[in-house]
A protein has these predicted regions:
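Outer-membrane beta-barrel "beta-signal"
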Residues: 18-19, 176-183, 201-212
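A short, acidic, flexible beta-alpha connecting loop/helix-capping segment that sits on the rim
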Residues: 190-195
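C-terminal outer-membrane beta-barrel translocator/porin domains of Gram-negative envelope proteins
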Residues: 2-142, 146-150, 154-156, 198, ...
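Short amphipathic alpha-helix initiation/capping segments at coil-to-helix junctions
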Residues: 117, 121, 161, 165-169, ...
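A short pocket-lining beta-strand/turn micro-motif at the edge of beta-sheets
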Residues: 140-144, 168-172, 181-185, 202-204
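Short basic/hydrophobic patches in alpha-helices and adjacent helix-turn junctions
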Residues: 130-133, 174-179
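Glycine-centered small-residue hotspots that permit tight backbone geometry or close packing
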Residues: 35, 97, 103, 169-175, ...
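Outer-membrane beta-barrel transmembrane domain signature
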Residues: 150-172
Length: 212
């Protein structure tokens, strides 16, 4: 880690006000077939060393492209900046959630400081998925899907290394969403389409929990 990166480490005592706005018209939370969801989150600094404000906007819409098909498109935008024009803390830097860019290890792409991935001040992701015809009989609780992801993390306020911000990452793959008695399970098999030479890819991923 660089000296500048080490200077951002330490313990801090901060107070933030979190505001959430959620407009949901989905017909159901799991295996959604119609509707959309708009979410906006803002993290306002009340008492903070860096006075960092974080904004997040998430939009997802569902619909049918053909009979017995469900397709979705989502947008994820996030920013984190200091109101005092200071360098934000390492813990306040942005890493994309794992379901926003499948085919890559979480936190293992984007800006680097030496050998360390440090996240960015900005992130954006665009995700498209579409169900494919049922392969198994009596599989109402299982969705087979095809997906395409494109995303980027960029911006280093103290820039002291490789931003890698010009590289748009993208991936393609197939997945299974399965509603079980223990909860929703998700399995994905993905392949990176575009990436940076420093990125760490990940072909298979398993998640316990919802994918919406």
């Amino acid at each position: 880690a660089s000296d500048r990166q080490k200077s951002q480490e330490g313990n801090y005592w901060d107070i933030f006000l979190n505001l959430n706005f959620d407009y949901d018209t989905r017909n159901q939370k799991f295996q959604t077939t119609d509707g959309s969801r708009n979410r906006y989150f803002v993290n306002l600094p009340m008492i903070s060393e860096t006075s960092t404000i974080t904004n997040t906007y998430i939009y997802k819409i569902y619909g049918e492209m053909y009979e017995s098909n469900v397709s979705s498109f989502s947008v994820y935008l996030k920013s984190s900046n200091s109101l005092k024009s200071k360098d934000i803390k390492l813990s306040e830097r942005i890493l994309l959630p794992s379901n926003r860019l499948r085919g890559f290890e979480r936190g293992k792409f984007g800006p680097k400081d030496g050998d360390d991935f440090i996240g960015g001040n900005y992130a954006a992701a665009f995700n498209f998925s579409s169900t494919i015809p049922k392969i198994l009989e009596n599989s109402e609780n299982i969705d087979f899907l095809f997906f395409l992801d494109a995303a980027n993390v960029w911006g280093v306020d103290y820039f002291n290394g490789d931003d890698e911000g010009s590289e748009i990452r993208s991936s393609i793959g197939i997945g299974i969403d399965w509603l079980t008695p223990v909860g929703p399970l998700s399995f994905t098999l993905a392949e990176a389409i575009t990436k940076s030479s420093t990125d760490v890819t990940e072909s298979f991923r398993f998640n316990l929990g919802t994918t919406f």
